[in-house]
Amino acid sequence: MKLLANTALALAFSATSALAADHGACAIGKTLTEGMLTIATGNPAYYPWVMNDAPESGEGFEAAVAYAIADKMGFSAEDVTWVRTSFDEAIQPGTKNFDFNMQQYSITPEREEMIDFSLPYYTSAMAVLTTQSVLDTGAEATLDSLMGLKWGAVATTTALPILSDVIQPESDPLLYNDNADVNAAIMAGQIDAALYDLPTALYLSAVVVEGGALLGQFPPEQSERPDQFGLLMEEGSPLKECVNAAISELTESGELAAIEAKWLAEATGVPVIE
């Protein structure tokens, strides 16, 4: 019995070692610096994607995902080095000073003509942008509460199906030409709330809309065409296959969902509207 147990343990260790070796082997000779993984982020990088503008801490959604991907590719935390780029600079075609870049890059056909994207590591939820004054009146993250709010939206937004089919407000939403008009209407008290993808809503509530607040977020599957974020790489990057394998494993194991829950639900305090 002891021999069987020891044999099983040895086989398990061998399988684990082989898996780690496979991960490491995938990236051999494919990174900018042999044995190192160079990851880019913004300058500065913002909450909740990177906490305190310190990606090396591994804190914040994208910082945590970056280290999880690195680990699956066979790189320890000590083997990861960070560089900074502007958002627009990295999208341009040409040679890159990083192996991959994480700055909430939405995967689009237009961008894929110039650079490579990984599989999605995040599918954006739709969030309810409002103001603290609306929250103070008793608005809650429930469909019953949302139905009674005055809504605004851009006429061409992909959020309209959620408004009409899911929220079903008691009064028709007011339609505007662009997001700037919607934001102005919120601040003027003409409307109570609007729907944006979660990253945009976080930014607007913190920087643009005076007294802005987030009431809640809908699961991504309730959006018709949700934004999906991918790792940005140089066109034709030999690392793409390795990165995609790592993301697939993190997705299938539930690790990616756990990181998202920690940094984009718990850390931001934006409740999910069921």
Predicted regions and their residues:
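Ligand-binding clefts/hinges and TM-proximal coupling segments of bilobed small-molecule sensing domains
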Residues: 21-22, 79, 158-174, 213-214, ...
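Acidic, polar ligand-binding/catalytic clefts
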Residues: 67, 78-145, 220-222
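Periplasmic-binding protein-like
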Residues: 43, 123-127, 198, 206-247, ...
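Bilobed "Venus flytrap"/periplasmic-binding protein-like clamshell domains
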Residues: 39, 44-45, 56-72, 106, ...
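Extended ligand-binding regions for polar small-molecule ligands
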Residues: 63-72, 134, 148-150, 157, ...
